């Protein structure tokens, strides 16, 4: 009897995998004065095949937008070449291997390169993208998420860092 109970209990536990860690990141407009209005959320969760980023955002222009994990846990503006740049305090793309290459989510460059987002005609994004090189949420805690104004070609040519342009929205990964 005891052996049957043990086997049954083990089977039940195996049927329900351990809950993976997840966190919700609030995304705010990146403005020269600092974070603006909330424009959506990104739920990051651990899953087989890499971290999953469930994006629900609005107020973007229709089309593709670069999406990255940035180095620092800040969305504050900063000064570059005498000009105030929104969310500059977030730093550059997360690149723990110091590759200095922007090769996309499948490449061997920045670990923070995520699949680009696609906003519909109403400027909304509701999709889940996977970062195959990022396995644990702990790898990116105390960093930031960034959505750029334009698309991303995952190359440093003809424009640096994929040509995504200005920083549109930013959120800190707690």
Swiss-Prot record:
GO terms for molecular function: copper ion binding; superoxide dismutase activity. This is Superoxide dismutase [Cu-Zn]. The gene is sodC. The lineage of its organism: Bacteria, Pseudomonadati, Pseudomonadota, Alphaproteobacteria, Hyphomicrobiales. Belongs to the Cu-Zn superoxide dismutase family. Its cofactor is Cu cation; Zn(2+). It catalyses: 2 superoxide + 2 H(+) = H2O2 + O2. Its EC number is 1.15.1.1. Zn(2+) binds at residues 93, 102, 110, 113.
């Amino acid at each position: 009897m005891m052996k049957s109970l043990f086997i049954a209990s083990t089977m039940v536990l195996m049927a329900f995998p351990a809950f993976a860690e997840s966190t919700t990141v609030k995304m705010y407009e990146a403005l020269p004065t600092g974070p603006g209005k909330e424009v959506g959320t990104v739920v990051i969760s651990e899953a087989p095949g890499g971290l999953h980023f469930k994006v629900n955002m609005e107020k973007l222009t229709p089309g593709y937008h670069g999406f990255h994990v940035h180095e620092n846990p800040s969305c504050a503006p900063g000064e570059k070449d005498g000009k105030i740049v929104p969310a500059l305090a977030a730093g550059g793309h997360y690149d723990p291997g110091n590759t200095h290459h922007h090769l996309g989510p499948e490449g061997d460059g920045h670990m923070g390169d995520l699949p680009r987002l696609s906003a519909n005609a109403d400027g909304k994004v509701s999709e889940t993208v996977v970062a195959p090189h990022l396995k644990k949420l702990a790898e990116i805690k105390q960093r930031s998420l960034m959505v750029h104004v334009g698309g991303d070609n995952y190359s440093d040519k003809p424009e640096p860092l994929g040509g995504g342009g200005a920083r549109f929205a930013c959120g800190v990964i707690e």
